[in-house]
């Protein structure tokens, strides 16, 4: 089916995620936190949704954008780098991407970077002229080089990019970097950022108009609630009115303070949702500023 062909009407939503790899478990955990559960098929590639009519396809990450573009899946959780690589390749072939990043999902952060041999004295992108650059992301790299006005040769490799300079097949590389340990092990150093990346929820540009539309809206609302609460805690305490302004200044990453019904002790009963780390040091600062009876609670679910 081509990207321009309308997908047949379905009453079940399909989501593609990695079968294995660094995004597989976080993606499945995120969807489970949204209330989804599945029954796995014998081939372990298809998971039938039991709690809701939302099925999973377990595939290679580089298959996910195409499955969305062709209407086989409605959504996918995939690295932004993979999504953009295939979109750039489609643009170069005169095809619409037919998919887009709906929202980031808070994991899988990495950077696509140029890395050169450690002995290089790096002065800037002008040094790339005439060089051979090995990468698994040729379309992204070609677009980036074009924007920089650099004429260099892109050497496409499907794996083991980091050994290309030692093998003599390239002068430098463009590859994903998380910790930098792999680069260091191959006597390479990162020198230039090409793209920031993270895992994203990708979806078709044309949203479904059948029974899936309601499922999609519900899933996105649940996911927003899960993502908002991922690093959030409910903070409850008592305080005198004269201390409220000082306490509010100590909570710049929190929602507005909510006053609860009086418990008869004279002080105000307050609560707020904190969206950053609530450390012991932070609680002690609040206590010194007048907060009493501090409690930090984990919140599992929320509908905004």
From Swiss-Prot:
Q: Which GO terms describe its molecular function?
A: ATP binding; ATP phosphoribosyltransferase activity; magnesium ion binding
Q: Top enzyme class of this protein?
A: transferase
Catalyses which reaction(s): 1-(5-phospho-beta-D-ribosyl)-ATP + diphosphate = 5-phospho-alpha-D-ribose 1-diphosphate + ATP
- Enumerate the cofactors the protein uses: Mg(2+)
Cite the entry's keywords alphabetically.
Amino-acid biosynthesis, ATP-binding, Cytoplasm, Glycosyltransferase, Histidine biosynthesis, Magnesium, Metal-binding, Nucleotide-binding, Transferase
| Entry keyword Nucleotidyltransferase | no
Q: Name one Pfam family in it.
A: HisG
Q: Per its UniProt record, what CDD domains does this chain match?
A: PBP2_HisGL2
Q: Which residues cross the membrane?
A: none
Kindly list the places in or outside the cell where this protein is found, as annotated in its UniProt entry: Cytoplasm
Disulfide-bonded cysteines: none
The cross-references to PROSITE patterns, in alphabetical order and at most eight, read: ATP_P_PHORIBOSYLTR (PS01316)
A GO cellular component annotated for this chain's UniProt record is: cytoplasm
What EC number(s) would the UniProt record show?
2.4.2.17
**What metabolic or biological pathway is this protein involved in?**
Amino-acid biosynthesis; L-histidine biosynthesis; L-histidine from 5-phospho-alpha-D-ribose 1-diphosphate: step 1/9
Q: Does the keyword Magnesium apply?
A: yes
Q: Could you provide one GO biological process annotation from this protein's UniProt record?
A: L-histidine biosynthetic process
- Activity modulation comment: Feedback inhibited by histidine.
Q: Which family does it belong to?
A: Belongs to the ATP phosphoribosyltransferase family. Long subfamily.
Query: What is this protein's function per UniProt?
Result: Catalyzes the condensation of ATP and 5-phosphoribose 1-diphosphate to form N'-(5'-phosphoribosyl)-ATP (PR-ATP). Has a crucial role in the pathway because the rate of histidine biosynthesis seems to be controlled primarily by regulation of HisG enzymatic activity.
Q: Protein name, please?
A: ATP phosphoribosyltransferase
Question: What high-level taxonomic lineage is stated for the organism?
Answer: Bacteria, Pseudomonadati, Pseudomonadota, Gammaproteobacteria, Lysobacterales
């Amino acid at each position: 089916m081509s990207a321009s062909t309308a997908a047949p009407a379905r009453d079940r939503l399909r989501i593609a995620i990695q079968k294995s790899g660094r995004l597989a478990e976080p993606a499945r955990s995120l969807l489970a936190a949204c209330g989804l559960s599945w029954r796995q098929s014998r081939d372990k590639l298809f998971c039938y949704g039991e709690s809701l009519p939302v099925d999973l396809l377990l595939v290679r990450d580089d298959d996910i954008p195409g499955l969305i573009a062709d209407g086989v899946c409605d959504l996918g959780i995939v690295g932004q780098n993979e999504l953009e690589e295939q979109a750039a390749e489609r643009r170069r072939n005169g095809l619409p991407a037919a998919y887009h990043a709906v929202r980031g999902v808070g994991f899988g952060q990495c950077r696509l970077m140029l890395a050169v041999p450690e002995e290089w004295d790096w002065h800037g992108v002008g040094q790339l002229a005439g060089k051979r650059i090995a990468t698994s992301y040729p379309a992204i790299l070609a677009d980036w080089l074009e924007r920089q006005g650099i004429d260099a040769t892109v050497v496409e490799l499907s794996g083991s990019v980091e050994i290309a300079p030692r093998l003599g097949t390239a002068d430098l590389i463009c590859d994903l970097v998380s910790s930098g340990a792999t680069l260091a092990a191959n006597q390479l150093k990162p020198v230039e950022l090409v793209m920031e990346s993270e895992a994203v929820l990708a979806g078709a540009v044309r949203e479904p108009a059948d029974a899936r539309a309601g499922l999609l809206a519900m899933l996105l609302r649940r996911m927003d609630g899960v993502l908002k609460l991922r690093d959030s805690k409910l903070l409850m305490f008592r305080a005198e009115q004269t201390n409220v302004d000082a306490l509010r200044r100590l909570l710049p990453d929190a929602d507005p303070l909510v006053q609860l019904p009086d418990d008869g002790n004279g002080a105000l009963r307050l609560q707020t949702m904190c969206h950053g780390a609530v450390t012991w040091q932070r609680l002690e600062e609040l206590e010194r500023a007048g907060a009493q009876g501090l409690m930090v609670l984990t919140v599992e679910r929320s509908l905004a």
